[in-house]
């Protein structure tokens, strides 16, 4: 939006976001570790929208009407456009395993609100299980071990950070996390998880038969 404003001085720019405030997704683990507040995750000035003459709309898009060049938000607002730029990026993925997707204490980590929910739940949690040892999973592990939590990571590949690192570098990172108390289960995946009566999952079964 900032670059478009530089190119189009007189254009009417509206930015619609599901996030209530601008924040760096790459720093969400710092929120989990309590090293930064929500406000300290922002990477723009307080007057960014006003200074760049950008209208900010909080909400979700439900309908994109390309014929009439209009979008409808979940809140019932209709916004017209000449050009529509969709830059939503990726999203967190919760595996369709057992009751993982409906449990009250299972979260992805993509938005600030996700980090806030994890932070709240972590207050009373001692043991935390993370499925996936990619960048986001290990960032979350860092944030939570900084809080003194006992963290276990499950990864279906034979090494951590399988997309980013070779086996030698991955082993080095793994050893550093293990020195901080993280336990890894590699080359296996979650196979079962059942919600208890209160909607919480307290154990996950791996395809090896191991229950965590």
Short names for language-model regions:
Residues 21, 92-93, 114, 136, ...:
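Surface-exposed, flexible loop/turn segments at secondary-structure boundaries
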Residues 10-12, 52, 56-72, 79, ...:
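A Rossmann-like FAD-binding core segment of flavoenzymes
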Residues 1-55, 143-164, 168:
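Beta1-alpha1 glycine-rich phosphate/pyrophosphate-binding loop at the start
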């Amino acid at each position: 939006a900032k670059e478009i404003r530089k190119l189009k001085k007189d254009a009417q720019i509206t930015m619609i976001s599901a996030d209530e405030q601008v924040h760096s997704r790459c720093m969400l683990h710092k929120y989990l570790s309590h090293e930064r507040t929500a406000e300290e995750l922002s990477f723009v000035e307080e007057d960014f929208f006003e200074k760049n003459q950008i209208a900010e709309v909080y909400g979700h898009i439900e309908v994109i009407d390309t014929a009439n060049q209009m979008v409808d938000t979940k809140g019932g607002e209709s916004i017209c456009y000449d050009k529509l730029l969709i830059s939503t990026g990726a999203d967190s993925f919760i595996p369709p395993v057992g009751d993982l997707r409906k449990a009250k204490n299972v979260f992805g980590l993509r938005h600030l609100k996700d980090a806030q929910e994890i932070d709240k739940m972590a207050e009373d949690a001692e043991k935390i299980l993370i499925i996936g040892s990619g960048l986001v999973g290990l960032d979350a592990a860092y944030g939570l071990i900084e809080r003194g939590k006992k963290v276990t990571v499950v990864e279906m590949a034979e090494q951590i950070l399988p997309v980013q690192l070779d086996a030698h570098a991955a082993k080095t990172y793994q050893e550093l996390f293990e020195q901080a108390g993280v336990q890894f289960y590699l080359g296996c995946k979650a196979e079962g998880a059942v919600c208890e009566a209160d909607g919480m999952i307290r154990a996950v079964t791996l395809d090896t038969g191991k229950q965590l």
